[in-house]
Design a protein with these regions (language model features):
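C-terminal catalytic domain of photolyase/cryptochrome flavoproteins
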Residues: 1-99, 107, 111-239
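Short, solvent-exposed turn/loop segments enriched in Gly/Ser/Thr/Pro and often Arg
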Residues: 103
């Protein structure tokens, strides 16, 4: 939901609410996915150059593929792969896809349609109500094989048929293709929050994806000014 993506509801609250309603055994997989979301945030914070390089690559690919038919067909759901077309429609109409479906979608985009993962990651962020920059970007990198070098995710016809109860048939996918290659590695960038400058501590800077102020250590502080760093909604399909 948009409440999750903007941090109005944080991950701890989600897990607590879920455990209050369902047993841990029924919740375990869901909790794992929530924790992965948190893990990816921390991972990217320590390696900010991954995000910088993604944006550079995205701009290059947008220029290169802007008018290419295969790209336009993909984002319009007009390919020869029925299940993919249905997922494009579902994503645009419901602003959501099941986690397993997101993996299939990304794999087909990268390895069967042969489109850049950066464009696929952007497409998700344009439409997912629960889109998170870290988990989305790194998830697409992982499917492509550049997040964990040499390890990629390939969607298969039998897997899609099994978990969609044979809803889709005759799914022609590229199921024998090596991972994408990236020789660049990213080291941890040490975070130094000891700023020697004399900063007015009566001001608060808030980002639009972390709005759970009631759960912070400074919820009772009296700030002179609160600054909100926000992306305009027209930059994303969040209404």
């Amino acid at each position: 939901s948009p409440y999750v993506t903007h941090g109005v509801i944080n991950e701890i609250e989600i897990i607590k609410k879920s455990l209050a309603k369902f047993s841990f055994s029924k919740n375990e997989k869901f909790i794992q996915e929530v924790l992965w979301r948190t893990y990816w945030k921390g991972w990217l914070e320590l390696r900010p150059n991954v995000w910088t390089d993604y944006l550079v690559g995205l701009n290059n690919m947008k220029e290169k593929f802007r008018d290419k038919k295969e790209y336009l067909n993909a984002i319009e759901g007009n390919t020869n792969i029925e299940c993919f077309n249905e997922w494009v429609k579902e994503l645009k109409e419901n602003n959501y896809l099941h986690n397993h479906t997101r993996m299939w979608f990304a794999s087909i985009w990268i390895f069967t349609l042969d489109l850049p993962w950066q464009l696929g990651a952007e497409f998700f962020m344009q439409h997912l109500y629960d889109g998170d920059a870290a988990s989305n970007t790194l998830g697409w990198r992982w499917v492509a094989g550049v997040q964990t070098q040499g390890k990629h995710y390939l969607a298969s016809e039998w897997n899609i048929k099994k978990f969609t109860n044979n809803r889709f048939n005759n799914i022609k996918l590229n199921e024998n293709v090596p991972p994408k290659v990236s020789e660049k590695t990213y080291s941890i960038v040490k975070q130094n929050f000891a700023n020697p400058q004399d900063i007015d501590q009566n001001n608060l800077l808030v980002f639009e994806n972390n709005l759970s102020l009631e759960t912070t250590d400074f919820k009772n502080n009296k700030f002179k000014k609160v600054y909100l760093v926000s992306n305009k909604n027209e930059n994303r399909s969040i209404k």
